[in-house]
Amino acid sequence: MSSTSEELLQKKCLPCEGGVEACSLEQAKSQRSAVPNWELRPDGKWIERSVRFKNFVKMIEAVNQIAELSEAEGHHPDLHLTGYRNLKIELTTHAIGGLSDNDFILAAKIDAILAQSGL
């Protein structure tokens, strides 16, 4: 069942040590509609977002905010910094080898952080 962005912002990531099914490709497509700035990889196992910041300092500020959020949620993205101001954010639930609700919850919360940066 898909959620809206507002609903995702109200949720908290739940610990996932495996033992649950990853979202199917159809479920992932449905959930992705709540986080339209994110791309779903063709295999349906990852979502990602690329962002270009005004400068290096603004990018690092956002990375630090994402790090704090990730620690609080207990769910962590892969972050790739390139070209001094480009950030690629990738989300998957490693324990299950695919996407879970946690990925979409964290994506919505990362979007809120990036919106504060004017992105």
Language model: regions and residue ranges:
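Long, contiguous binding/interaction regions
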Residues: 1-119
